[in-house]
Amino acid sequence: MKALGYWLMVVGSLRLASVWFGFFNIWALRLAVFSQTTMSEVHGRTFGVWTLLTCTLCFLCAFNLENKPLYLATFLSFIYALGHFLTEYLFYQTMTIANLSTVGFFAGTSIVWMLLEWNSLEQPHSKLS
């Protein structure tokens, strides 16, 4: 397995921990992510379901890095997550810069790494003699 695959499993595991907070410990989720606003339990469960989906993408992609559609969906999940959290910080002020920095580190690293690895997904073309 490539190093990117291991990285995606680490990120997927961290996302899985966030799923727990979304479903069962809304207080911890509020402190860890959305510290500038109130959250209801339905917000936590919605966050948990979204995060479970992105966690699943990370694990599937980690074991199938050569699958371009899956790779692209996983890559876009990082773009969407970073965009969402940037919006929460910049426009709605529901996050602190410290919380955004944590999300930004994992999403940003994943985005850059996946971009760098994108061209290595090309399958060599067989030569016709």
UniProtKB/Swiss-Prot annotation:
A GO molecular-function descriptor: protein-macromolecule adaptor activity
Protein's UniProt keywords contain Transmembrane helix: yes
Biological processes annotated in GO: regulation of auxin polar transport; sterol biosynthetic process
Keywords associated with the record: Endoplasmic reticulum, Lipid biosynthesis, Lipid metabolism, Membrane, Steroid biosynthesis, Steroid metabolism, Sterol biosynthesis, Sterol metabolism, Transmembrane, Transmembrane helix
GO cellular component: endoplasmic reticulum; endoplasmic reticulum membrane
Record's subcellular location: Endoplasmic reticulum membrane
Membrane topology: Multi-pass membrane protein
Residues spanning the membrane: 4-24, 46-66, 71-91, 96-116
Family: Belongs to the ERG28 family.
Protein name: Ergosterol biosynthetic protein 28
Organism per entry: Arabidopsis thaliana
